[in-house]
């Protein structure tokens, strides 16, 4: 099973919008995750700990990014945006294996952008 966590041990229930970019030679890229009203920002989670990163967990292990930011509207947190930088073809392959598992577990589909 593939899950996303912001505090280790607590699975995020909200499924994000994920946008991918990749360099022309395929060696690097970015994955931008946007969670609208994620469970981790709920008042009931305040005593669970601090957000220390985004942890992508699956049967192969975990992928970690520390580039995590909250978006506020009228002083209240409404969304989380996390950016994972993919630095090599091997990292890209590993990330895509995670996303295939996560998509399968959460009913997501992949739509390729028109180029």
Curated annotation (Swiss-Prot):
It is a peripheral membrane protein. It comes from the Eukaryota. One of its GO terms (cellular component) is photosystem II. It comes from Porphyra purpurea (Red seaweed). Part of the photosystem II complex. This is Photosystem II reaction center Psb28 protein. It is found in: Plastid, Chloroplast thylakoid membrane. The gene is psb28. Coiled coil: none annotated. One of its GO terms (biological process) is photosynthesis. Belongs to the Psb28 family. Pfam families: Psb28 (PF03912). Keywords: Chloroplast, Membrane, Photosynthesis, Photosystem II, Plastid, Thylakoid. The lineage of its organism: Eukaryota, Rhodophyta, Bangiophyceae, Bangiales, Bangiaceae. NCBIfam families: PS_II_psb28.
